[in-house]
Structures are given as C-alpha cells and as structure tokens.
Amino acid sequence: MLDDEQVKAIWCARGGYGTVRIIDLLDFRKFAANPKWVIGYSDITVLHAHLNGRGVETLHAQMPLDIDKKTPETAKSLKELLFGNTYTIRYTDISHMLLFT
C-alpha cells in the first residue's frame, strides 16, 4: 500500500506493537514520490514520527475500530480534512490547560 499510487490514504485499524518492529524494514523511496495520508494513533506513532521526519504530513487521529464510540463530529471532521476542507478552531484562553512544575 505504501507504493500503490491509487491508494490515497492508509487508515490503521488499530494499534499494537508491530510498527516499531518493522519500521526499519520499510522502503519509503516510492512513498516519498507519491505520499498519502497515514491515519491512526498508538503504535502508529512510530510511523507518524518516521514520516514527519521526512517532511510528510500525517494524521494522528481516531482509528476506525473505535470511531463509533466517539461523537459524530469526530468522523465528520476527519472526513472533511481528508477531502480537502479546512476549518478554524478558536479559543479564548488556554491558561487553565497549562501545567507548570
């Protein structure tokens, strides 16, 4: 799938521990010429970091396994992003979210 030009996104179904074991075995040369969205979190973070280090944007986002347990906005925002729509997130004060030790 990494090299398939017709594949536009790879949405990882669930986490696990396999990515860290195979990341050094993957050849990303063709992928770099035809990048695609890689979507997921957990174990997939290794793949995100690897691709981000090569200048490829990825989506650290909900996996399909649990998306039905989230709000409808979760699926909607992911779909909009994948189809090129953008939106702005506005906030007024995040000081209550900051933790200093």
Q: Where do the PLM segments sit?
A:
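Short, acidic/small-residue loops that bind anionic groups at enzyme active sites
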Residues: 26-51, 57-64
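Charged/polar, solvent-exposed surface patches and flexible loops
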Residues: 24, 49, 76, 80
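Conserved anion/nucleotide-ligand pocket segment
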Residues: 56-101
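Hydrophobic structural segments
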Residues: 1-3, 49-50, 59, 99
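Context-gated lysine
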Residues: 8, 30, 36, 69-70, ...
